[in-house]
Amino acid sequence: DLWSWGQMIQETGLLPSYTTY
């Protein structure tokens, strides 16, 4: 799901804007 992307992105720090998901 998209929420997983927010978690992974937050960890990687590639796209902080995606943390909203």
Curated annotation (Swiss-Prot):
pH dependence per the entry: Optimum pH is 8.2.
Record note on modification: Contains seven disulfide bonds.
The EC number(s) this enzyme carries: 3.1.1.4
Catalytic activity: a 1,2-diacyl-sn-glycero-3-phosphocholine + H2O = a 1-acyl-sn-glycero-3-phosphocholine + a fatty acid + H(+)
Keywords noted in UniProt: Calcium, Disulfide bond, Hydrolase, Lipid degradation, Lipid metabolism, Metal-binding, Myotoxin, Secreted, Toxin
Domain of life: Eukaryota
Cofactor(s) the record lists: Ca(2+)
Temperature dependence (free text): Optimum temperature is 35-45 degrees Celsius.
Co-factor: note: Binds 1 Ca(2+) ion per subunit.
Tissues with expression: Expressed by the venom gland.
One annotated GO biological process: lipid catabolic process
Activity regulation description: Inhibited by crotapotin.
Family: Belongs to the phospholipase A2 family. Group II subfamily.
Subunit composition and interactions: Can form dimers, trimers and tetramers.
Name used for this protein in its record: Basic phospholipase A2 BjIV
Species the sequence originates in: Bothrops jararacussu
